[in-house]
C-alpha cells in the first residue's frame, strides 16, 4: 500500500494565496517526515479552489526541499500548455531528483484558461490525444517532430533525454519519468490503456465506479497487446480525502465545518470559455459524500476504508486531500497521524 497526499493549495474564505501555498509546502515536509509515499500537486488558474498555477514549478521546489518522498502532478493540464515544454520540464525534474518525479496529465475542463493561454475549445474537446502522443514521444525518443493538426514542427533533438538518469554507482537507469493520466470518461480510460499508462481516478468516484474503470482499462490494455504482467502491475492511483481524529464524528465535523465554504467560493469562481451552462455541486452534500467514501475518522476506520477500496478496485496507491480543515496546524497534525497511525495498520 502506497499512501500519499493530494495537495490543492486550497484558499479557504478569509485566507490569502500565500497562506494556502505555505500550507502546501509545510504539509509536504510533514508528509516526508511521517513516512508517506508521495505528494500529488493540483494545478488551477484564476480560482481560489486551488492557487497553484503550475504543478511542475511547485514540484521542483518540493523535490528540492525533500530527499525521499515522490512528488507528482495531479495534474498538469495538456490543453493549456505545449507538450514539448512540459516534456522538457518533466525530464529535468526526473533527472535532477534521482527519479522521484511522476508526471500526471489530464485535459482539464472547459474553462476560460483555454482562451487565456490560446488553446481554445478545440484543444479541450479534440486535442488531448495528440498532445499526449507528442509528450510521450518527447520522453521516449532521441529526436521528435510535430506532425499533428495542432503541433507541426521540424525534427529536433531531445535535450535532456529523460531516459539518461544516473544511478548512485554512476551508471544509467533506463526509462523516463512515470506518466499517469487523469481519467473521468471511458474514452480517456481507453486512451490511457492503449498507451499502457496508469490512471488517476477522482475523489468524487466510489469504489464500484473505480473498479469498473479499472476493469475497462485492463480489457483495453490486453486487447492492445499489453502483457498480462504489465496490466497486473499497473500503478493506478485513487484520489480521496483523509481526516484523522479520535472519533468519527469529530473528523466529519471538521470537514463539514470548513470545506463547504471553500468549495462554494472555489467552484463558483470557475468561468466556462464558451458560456455553457454548468451545475455546481451542493457544497455540503458533496462534503458529506466525501466523508462517507474516504478515510475520515479514527486511524482504524481510515485504514479499513483504504484496505476495502484496495480490495474492491485493485488500486493500492492513494492520493489523499489532507487540507480539508483549512488550518495549518490541523493539516500538519492530520498528515502526521496519517503517516504514523494509519500507515502502520496497512503494512
Residue ranges of model-derived segments:
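A structural motif
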Residues: 36, 98, 197, 313-315
Amino acid at each position: 500500500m502506497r499512501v500519499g497526499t493530494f495537495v490543492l493549495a486550497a484558499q479557504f474564505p478569509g485566507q490569502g494565496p500565500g497562506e494556502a501555498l505555505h500550507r502546501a509546502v509545510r504539509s509536504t515536509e510533514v508528509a516526508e517526515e511521517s513516512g508517506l509515499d508521495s505528494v500529488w500537486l493540483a494545478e488551477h488558474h484564476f480560482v481560489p479552489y486551488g492557487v497553484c498555477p503550475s504543478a511542475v514549478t511547485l514540484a521542483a521546489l518540493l523535490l528540492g526541499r525533500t530527499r525521499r518522498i515522490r512528488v507528482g502532478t495531479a495534474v498538469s493540464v495538456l490543453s493549456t500548455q505545449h507538450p514539448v515544454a512540459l516534456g522538457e520540464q518533466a525530464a529535468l525534474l526526473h533527472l535532477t531528483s534521482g527519479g522521484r518525479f511522476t508526471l500526471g496529465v489530464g485535459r482539464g475542463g472547459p474553462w476560460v484558461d483555454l482562451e487565456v493561454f490560446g488553446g481554445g475549445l478545440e484543444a479541450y474537446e479534440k486535442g488531448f490525444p495528440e498532445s499526449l502522443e507528442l509528450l510521450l514521444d518527447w520522453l521516449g525518443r532521441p529526436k521528435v517532430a510535430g506532425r499533428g493538426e495542432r503541433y507541426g514542427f521540424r525534427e529536433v533533438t531531445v535535450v535532456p533525454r529523460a531516459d539518461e538518469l544516473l544511478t548512485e554507482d554512476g551508471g544509467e537507469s533506463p526509462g523516463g519519468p512515470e506518466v499517469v493520466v487523469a481519467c473521468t470518461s471511458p474514452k480517456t480510460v481507453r486512451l490511457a490503456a492503449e498507451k499502457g499508462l496508469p490512471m488517476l481516478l477522482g475523489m468524487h468516484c466510489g469504489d464500484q465506479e473505480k473498479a469498473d474503470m479499472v476493469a475497462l482499462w485492463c480489457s483495453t490494455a490486453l486487447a492492445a497487446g499489453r502483457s498480462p504482467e504489465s496490466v497486473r502491475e499497473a500503478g493506478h492511483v485513487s484520489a480521496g480525502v483523509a481526516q484523522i481524529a479520535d472519533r468519527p464524528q469529530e473528523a466529519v465535523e471538521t470537514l463539514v465545518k470548513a470545506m463547504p465554504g471553500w468549495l462554494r467560493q472555489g467552484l463558483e469562481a470557475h468561468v466556462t470559455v464558451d458560456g455553457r451552462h454548468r451545475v455546481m455541486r451542493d457544497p455540503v452534500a458533496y462534503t458529506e459524500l466525501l466523508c462517507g467514501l474516504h478515510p475520515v475518522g479514527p486511524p482504524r476506520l481510515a485504514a479499513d476504508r483504504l484496505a476495502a477500496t484496495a480490495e474492491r478496485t485493485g488500486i493500492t496507491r492513494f492520493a489523499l486531500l489532507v487540507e480539508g480543515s483549512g488550518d495549518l496546524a490541523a493539516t500538519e497534525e492530520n498528515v502526521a497521524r496519517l503517516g504514523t497511525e494509519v500507515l502502520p495498520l496497512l503494512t
